[in-house]
């Protein structure tokens, strides 16, 4: 979360209170349940510890791959099972293709926003239950859909290119803490 990251901006990142409220409002508008998973402990133990350990060893970590592979997908599918859901969908810019009973992550339509590189570690079992609805759209198309649906506030949000738990992109400050 932003407090432990040293960020001065509460509204940065995918897990900000504003982002959670935006997701809840859309869920209410579209008539489906909004669930929040508290995976801070697992995230800290697995992703943040890995990140700091790798940096201290002089290596460049890729925490997003670990998070997607071991934290996010496991937690989402566990909750999906409890809710009786067969599939999960995320907002990643990527595609899942099935060829000869094997599942592959491939680049999304918008190559400037492609996130397939961060999804390579997801297991076959988990990929078989995953959908990426944004994978067949360009970012501008998504903005148009959001605007036409009355979500102008989402279109105006700035995009984040940083690691979610280092939202100011200040690794040095984060590692000191």
Outline where the language-model segments fall.
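ATP-dependent adenylation/nucleotidyltransferase module used to activate substrates
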Residues: 1-120, 131, 140-142
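Contiguous mid-protein beta-loop-alpha structural module that forms a pocket-lining wall or clamp
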Residues: 114, 118-177
């Amino acid at each position: 979360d932003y407090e432990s990251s040293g960020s001065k901006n509460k509204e940065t990142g995918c897990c900000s209170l504003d982002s959670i409220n935006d997701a809840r409002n859309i869920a209410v508008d579209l008539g489906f349940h909004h669930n929040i998973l508290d995976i801070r402990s697992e995230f800290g133990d697995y992703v943040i510890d890995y990140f700091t350990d790798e940096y201290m060893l002089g290596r460049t970590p890729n925490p997003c791959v670990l998070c997607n592979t071991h934290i996010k997908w496991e937690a989402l599918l566990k909750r999906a099972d409890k809710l009786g859901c067969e599939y999960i969908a995320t907002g990643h810019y990527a595609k899942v293709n099935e060829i000869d009973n094997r599942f592959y992550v491939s680049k999304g339509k918008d190559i400037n926003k492609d996130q397939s590189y961060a999804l390579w570690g997801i297991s076959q079992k988990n990929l078989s239950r995953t959908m990426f609805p944004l994978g067949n759209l360009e970012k501008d198309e998504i903005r148009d859909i959001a605007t036409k649906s009355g979500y102008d506030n989402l279109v105006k949000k700035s995009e984040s290119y940083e690691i979610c738990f280092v939202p100011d992109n200040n690794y040095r400050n984060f590692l000191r803490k």
